[in-house]
Amino acid sequence: MNTLDSLQLTDNTILIFTSDNGPVIDDGYQDHAYELLNGHTPMGIYRGGKYSAYEAGTRIPFIVRWPAKVKPSKQQSLFSQIDVYASLASLLNQPLRKGAAPDSQ
């Protein structure tokens, strides 16, 4: 972000920070996942993990930085990453090919 700022590209650049949902600790593999945690709690204060409907399995970060268009705020609304594809295409006035991103709106 500092480089974008120094090159004066910040206002015309969309930065999106996001992640996949939920940690996987016990998925049946012999990968020493529990031992490698070493006290780290990847699900934080939440219950569950990947493959669960609990909050640690469904919460994701989604941070957008685009100073020219997006005012800093915090939303508690439900969000699906599936919609990013069509949303970015629309934002950039790019048509989607027929059958592309059928679940994205």
Where in this protein do the model-derived segments appear?
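Metal-dependent active-site segment of extracytoplasmic phospho-/sulfohydrolases and closely related
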Residues: 1-29
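Short glycine/serine-rich loop/turn segments
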Residues: 24-40
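Substrate-binding rim/cap in mid-to-C-terminal beta-strand-loop elements of soluble/periplasmic
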Residues: 1-6, 35-105
